[in-house]
C-alpha cells in the first residue's frame, strides 16, 4: 500500500490515496482483531512456553494479555505513519510519537512510585496500550486535517464486523481451552511446554476457523482482499 499511496500522493490523487489507506486499515484490522483475541485467550499457554513455575506463568500471561489490548491501535498507527511518509511528511509522526513516549515515560515513573511490585509490569503494559491508543487518535486527527475525513470508506463498519465475528470465535476458543483442562495449576494446558503448544494450536485453529467462517458468511470484502494478496504472493513464489 505504501508504494501506491506514494504514487497517488505525488499525482495529487487523494481519493485513490484515501482508498488505499482505508483498505490497508481494514485489512490490518481484520488480522489484528483476531490476533488480539487469540493472544488474550492463549496468554497463559503462551507464557508457559517461556516460564516454568505456575506463578511465573500467571504473571507473564497477565502481561501478554495487557499488551494485546493495544494491538489494534498500534496497527492503525503503523498504517497512518506510512500515510504520512507517503505524503513526504516525517515531522508529524515525530510529533505524535514524541507525545506517546512522553505519556509512557511520565506514566511509568508514576506507576513505579505507586504500584505494588506484583502489578507493576502489568500496569506498565496497560499504560503502553493506553499511550499507543492516544497516539493513534492524535495521528488520525492530524491526518484528517491533512487529507480530510475518511467518512464513507467503511473503516468503522468493517471494524464493527470484525468485532462481531471475533466474539463467537473468542467464546469457541474459551470452550476449547476449558475442554482441554483450563488454565489452573497442573492442568493439561499448562502441564508442560509441549502440551501448551498443542493446546495453543487447537484453540487457535478453532478460533481461526470460526472467525474466517463468519467473515465468509458476512461476505467480507477485506477477506477477499487478503485472499487475493496471499494468492498473488504464493503465485509469484511458485513460478
For the regions a language model picked out, list residue spans one by one.
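Membrane-embedded alpha-helical bundles of multi-pass transporters/translocases
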Residues: 1-239
Amino acid at each position: 500500500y505504501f508504494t501506491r499511496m506514494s504514487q497517488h500522493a505525488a499525482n495529487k490523487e487523494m481519493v485513490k490515496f484515501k482508498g488505499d489507506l482505508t483498505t490497508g486499515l481494514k485489512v490490518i484490522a481484520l488480522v489484528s482483531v483476531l490476533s488480539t483475541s487469540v493472544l488474550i485467550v492463549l496468554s497463559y499457554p503462551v507464557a508457559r512456553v517461556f516460564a516454568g513455575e505456575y506463578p511465573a506463568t500467571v504473571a507473564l500471561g497477565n502481561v501478554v494479555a495487557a499488551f494485546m489490548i493495544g494491538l489494534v491501535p498500534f496497527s492503525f498507527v503503523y498504517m497512518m505513519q506510512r500515510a504520512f511518509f507517503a505524503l513526504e511528511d516525517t515531522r508529524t509522526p515525530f510529533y505524535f510519537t514524541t507525545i506517546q513516549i512522553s505519556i509512557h515515560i511520565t506514566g511509568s515513573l508514576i506507576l513505579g512510585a505507586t504500584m505494588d511490585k506484583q502489578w507493576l509490569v502489568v500496569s506498565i503494559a496497560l499504560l503502553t496500550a493506553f499511550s499507543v491508543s492516544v497516539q493513534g487518535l492524535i495521528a488520525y486527527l492530524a491526518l484528517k486535517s491533512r487529507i480530510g475525513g475518511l467518512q464513507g470508506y467503511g473503516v468503522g463498519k468493517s471494524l464493527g464486523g470484525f468485532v462481531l465475528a471475533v466474539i463467537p470465535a473468542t467464546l469457541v476458543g474459551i470452550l476449547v481451552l476449558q475442554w482441554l483442562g483450563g488454565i489452573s495449576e497442573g492442568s493439561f494446558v499448562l502441564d508442560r511446554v509441549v502440551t501448551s503448544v498443542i493446546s495453543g494450536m487447537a484453540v487457535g485453529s478453532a478460533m481461526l476457523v470460526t472467525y474466517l467462517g463468519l467473515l465468509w458468511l458476512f461476505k467480507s470484502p477485506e477477506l477477499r482482499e487478503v485472499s487475493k494478496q496471499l494468492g498473488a504472493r504464493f503465485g509469484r513464489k511458485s513460478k
